[in-house]
Curated annotation (Swiss-Prot):
<keyword id="KW-0689">Ribosomal protein</keyword>
<dbReference type="InterPro" id="IPR001705">
    <property type="entry name" value="Ribosomal_bL33"/>
</dbReference>
<dbReference type="InterPro" id="IPR038584">
    <property type="entry name" value="Ribosomal_bL33_sf"/>
</dbReference>
<dbReference type="GO" id="GO:0003735">
    <property type="term" value="F:structural constituent of ribosome"/>
</dbReference>
<comment type="similarity">
    <text>Belongs to the bacterial ribosomal protein bL33 family.</text>
</comment>
<dbReference type="GO" id="GO:1990904">
    <property type="term" value="C:ribonucleoprotein complex"/>
</dbReference>
<dbReference type="GO" id="GO:0006412">
    <property type="term" value="P:translation"/>
</dbReference>
<dbReference type="InterPro" id="IPR011332">
    <property type="entry name" value="Ribosomal_zn-bd"/>
</dbReference>
<dbReference type="Pfam" id="PF00471">
    <property type="entry name" value="Ribosomal_L33"/>
</dbReference>
<dbReference type="GO" id="GO:0005840">
    <property type="term" value="C:ribosome"/>
</dbReference>
<keyword id="KW-0687">Ribonucleoprotein</keyword>
<dbReference type="GO" id="GO:0005737">
    <property type="term" value="C:cytoplasm"/>
</dbReference>
<protein>
    <recommendedName>
        <fullName>Large ribosomal subunit protein bL33</fullName>
    </recommendedName>
</protein>
<dbReference type="InterPro" id="IPR018264">
    <property type="entry name" value="Ribosomal_bL33_CS"/>
</dbReference>
Length: 54
């Protein structure tokens, strides 16, 4: 049942250091592509681009 979930849990990883810093949910119907957000990376200690990982 989790495979057909409309709002699955996704992980956001920093593009610079590749650390997985955030876990969130997204609506698959509204955003079918990979999610990209600018969030704070505690490892880099600055705001960086975070991309959805699988």
């Amino acid at each position: 049942m989790a495979a057909t979930d409309v709002r699955p849990k996704i992980t956001l990883a920093c593009q610079e250091c590749k650390h997985r810093n955030y876990i969130t949910r997204k609506n698959r119907r509204n955003t079918p592509d990979r999610l990209e957000l600018r969030k704070y990376c505690p490892n880099c200690r600055t705001h960086r681009e975070h991309r959805e990982t699988r």
